[in-house]
UniProtKB/Swiss-Prot annotation:
General function of this protein: Catalyzes the reversible transfer of the terminal phosphate group between ATP and AMP. Plays an important role in cellular energy homeostasis and in adenine nucleotide metabolism.
Similarity comment text for this entry: Belongs to the adenylate kinase family.
The protein, known as: Adenylate kinase
Reaction catalyzed: AMP + ATP = 2 ADP
InterPro entries per the UniProt record, alphabetical: Adenyl_kin_sub, Adenylat/UMP-CMP_kin, Adenylat_kinase_CS, Adenylate_kinase_lid-dom, P-loop_NTPase
């Protein structure tokens, strides 16, 4: 099963990716992890990517697609994979298609912006341990304090409402067009497209996913 995950940051893709990895024994592939691995291993593509990144330049789509193709040709992807964070743009989706990679299923996690802002801006973190709380869904016993040590909890820069809104704006501009792209691909019979309501409880979303995946 070759799957693409679409959805804004905070839409719950990571949680459900974990569920699918365990169910099918397929790896989750994120471009960030791939770049780091290729650079660490000193592969030809890794060297090219590093040179560009060191200059503060964006890695071109062709290079990203080449890295993805390299990664999905590895033995652990024989039964499929989950692509998370790629493709991000229409040119990347086109390049992936042109390179001959057949995607079986595109899953969209649909969550309204205001829900995502509430989810992410409500997070509180105990930095030394990495323990995470949420003011609504998983509050600490004492407001603003870690349950174990009693130390202060912080709001990460990434979780501040203004940062979340910025990330959502980028998502809508760059990645939202992919929803129309893959809906059209599904209508043309080239893939299957399923939308999941990411506001439902985790277990419900997982149960729905299990049905879709058969």
């Amino acid at each position: 099963m070759k799957i693409i995950l679409l959805g804004a940051p905070g839409a719950g893709k990571g949680t459900q990716a974990q569920f699918m990895m365990n169910k099918f024994g397929i790896p989750q592939i994120s471009t960030g992890d791939m770049f780091r691995a290729a650079i660490k291993e000193g592969t030809e593509l890794g060297k090219q990517a590093k040179a560009l990144m060191d200059e503060g330049k964006l890695v071109p789509d062709e290079l990203t697609v080449a890295l993805v193709k390299d990664r999905i040709a590895q033995p652990d992807c024989a039964n499929g994979f989950l692509l998370d964070g790629f493709p991000r743009t229409i040119p990347q989706a086109d390049a992936l298609k042109d390179s001959g990679v057949k995607i079986d299923l595109v899953l969209e996690f649909d969550v309204a912006d205001e829900v995502i802002v509430e989810r992410m801006s409500g997070r509180r973190v105990h930095q030394p341990s990495g323990r995470t709380y949420h003011v609504v869904y998983n509050p600490p016993k004492v407001e603003g304090k870690d349950d174990v040590t009693g130390e202060d909890l912080i709001i990460r820069q990434d979780d501040k409402p203004e940062t979340v809104l910025e990330r959502l704006a980028i998502y809508h501009k760059q990645t939202k067009p992919l929803i129309a792209y893959y809906t059209a691909e599904a209508e043309a019979g080239n893939t299957r497209y399923e939308r999941l309501d990411g506001t439902k409880p985790v277990e419900e979303v997982s149960a729905e996913l299990a049905k879709i995946l058969g």
